[in-house]
Amino acid sequence: MSKPFVAVLMGSDSDLPTMQATLDVLKTFDIQFEAKVTSAHRTPAATHAYVTDAEARGCKVFICAAGLAAHLAGAVAGITTRPVIGVPIDNGPLQGHDALLSTVMMPGGVPVATVAIGSAGAKNAGYLAAQMLAVGDDELAAAVKAERQKAAEAVQAKDAKLQAKLAQ
């Protein structure tokens, strides 16, 4: 079996600009990943085959992005017992609200961990996958913790700058 990896599945190639945030986070932590366009509706057999094969090859987390009806994450969760993270894409007439509801409303026993709509959610999907993998990887856990510390220091620096400006 190869090194553990994350599978990033998108319902359309138009989802890539949003999902680039996920890929960037995974790269930050040197997490191996595969990215693929597949559809719960248009290519269900291919989606099933990929998920089954990816799991056999060492995929530990699936991140699924889709807009509108957004059944990809739910379809994947029905195939695997690996964690599935759903990213609702902010497109269509409802700007992702339909995708959010389609992704989050799963039957009991078939969970999808759903993040926010759009790019913020895509970024958090990468961090959530890293945290899931870090449960069994102390080095990755330390890297995630260091990244959080770096973000905290950036906030503190901004506050210090604000306080200095207000003191003038």
Feature map (PLM): residue ranges:
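N-terminal beta-loop-helix "entrance" segment that forms/cooperates
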Residues: 35-56
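Short glycine-rich or small-residue beta-strand-to-loop segments that form or flank ligand, phosphate
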Residues: 5-10, 34-36, 62-64, 85, ...
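Short, solvent-exposed amphipathic alpha-helical segments in soluble enzyme
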Residues: 22-28, 52, 79-81, 130-131
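Glycine-rich phosphate/diphosphate-binding loop of Rossmann-like nucleotide-binding domains
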Residues: 2-42
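C-terminal binding/interaction regions
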Residues: 4, 9-17, 21, 97-168
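Short glycine/serine/threonine-rich phosphate/pyrophosphate-binding segments
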Residues: 15-19, 44-47, 66-75, 94-97, ...
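Short, ordered loop/turn segments at secondary-structure junctions
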Residues: 13, 38-40, 67-68, 89-92, ...
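Glycine-rich phosphate-binding loop
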Residues: 50-92
